[in-house]
Amino acid sequence: MTAPASSPASPYDPLDIAVELIRCPSVTPDEGGALGVLEKWLAPLGFKCERMRFSAEGTPDVDNLYARLGSGHPHFCFAGHTDVVPVGQADAWSVDPFAADIKDGRLYGRGAADMKSAVASFVAAAERISREGFQGSISLLITGDEEGPSINGTRKMLEKLAARNETIDHCIVGEPTSVEKLGDMIKVGRRGSINGWLTVQGTQGHVAYPHLADNPVPRLLEMLRRLDAHVLDEGTDHFQPSNLEVTTVDIGNTATNVIPGSARATVNIRFNDLHTGASLDKWMRGVLDAVTAEMGGSYSFKTSVSGEAFITEPGAFSALIAEAAKEVTGITPELSTTGGTSDARFIRAYAPVVEIGLPNATMHKADENTGVSEIRQLADIYETVLRGYFAGRAS
């Protein structure tokens, strides 16, 4: 298959769409008009656009968009988000974060890399395919809650689709997976992530009278030492070794002559598919119990799993995407599971999912930007994937 030529003169130039999206101040959880921009571009192509708004106690309400063209199978879905992280320190920017300035062949603005430009690229690719016709369905699953708690977005959209027996066959997520050059890395899985909050109880007292107090700090330090020293695994064929990091230690004591009454710490484990959140919770509690049995005292501990490890086994679907990237860019992408979590962790329970998007060097930074040519090339990659997919090359 020959890679399609970039089409900047097309009425669906992805740059135009990206500029419109970046000009929407959609700092999570605010929609900022971005979903309306997408509806404006998608509806004329025949996409049925459906707003999905979800709520949950203690979290902000979130607007999301599900747009589908066609009703049959195979059903190819693009998942992404239009919410962005806050600007941060405004004077660190050399441009207006929401002006979508173009300088020296690069598009600047919050969301340029993560990931409004990728959303724009897929819309442009879908327009090209829709003009020629295809057998099956194309959809976009766009959330406004990826950069936030991730409670009222992709996960609930997928649950709603499943409740009405609407299935997705394969999915691409447009996260910025590339490292140095467009197409040099795609994600075929992600590590899991579990946070743990530990509080060791003691008895506050004067440092001159330690026999009248109970210092929790030595017990906390021993617990953290044992957790940190343990080698969880050596990695697998597709994953790095699992890793625990102590992320905070807080005694809450500013006085030098007071033994604290409690000591707290948090830990995070990024883990591969040799573990689950439940198995790691059990292991950590075992370590804490052992220290408590030896040193006395008491503790409280809670955990939260933001995502389990998963892998989309290399096969026809990942090969289709890798080949499309190579055809357009000339680069053979690395199939990787590195990095943080993404909404692919929710999608993997419903369909095979692979992530491919723009270079990620400037995401979440001041002066976030991406190359104009890269936006158009990414549209070419997505178009090549869609052509191959509906030609049956994913199975």
From Swiss-Prot:
Protein family (similarity comment): Belongs to the peptidase M20A family. DapE subfamily.
Catalytic activity: N-succinyl-(2S,6S)-2,6-diaminopimelate + H2O = (2S,6S)-2,6-diaminopimelate + succinate
Quaternary structure, from the entry: Homodimer.
Gene field: dapE
UniProt-recorded name of the protein: Succinyl-diaminopimelate desuccinylase
UniProt entry tagged with the keyword Protein biosynthesis: no
E.C. code: 3.5.1.18
Upper taxonomic lineage: Bacteria, Pseudomonadati, Pseudomonadota, Alphaproteobacteria, Hyphomicrobiales
Chain sites annotated for binding Zn(2+) 1: H81, D114, E175
CDD domains found in the cross-reference section: M20_DapE_proteobac
